[in-house]
């Protein structure tokens, strides 16, 4: 199952560019999470320590009462929680039964301590995202 999960993780921008070996290593740390329709997966304002990639089903992303996005298979959320464990910026609810790969921050951090190449790759991805976010501000 780790090989298929590694393929799912390869589609996540935070992990783009990682070797297959590193993707398999991260995949080995994931667990399957199951949420019935209507269940809260993440709650805005609460601390987050888990990253999810949806493998089956659909979910809704809300800020307050307003729906800001809809998620389906291969969509992901909570990646910033892997880095800082800060509060969730939105709520995510299962619109139908959802299955997802989940990766907990503590497991991810332990792996990073043993795999410095992964740290460098992720820092590069985050730096690129920061530059892209700052571009409109500089104009």
Labelled PLM ranges:
Residues 1-139:
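Cytosolic regulatory regions built on CNB/CRP/Popeye-like sensor folds
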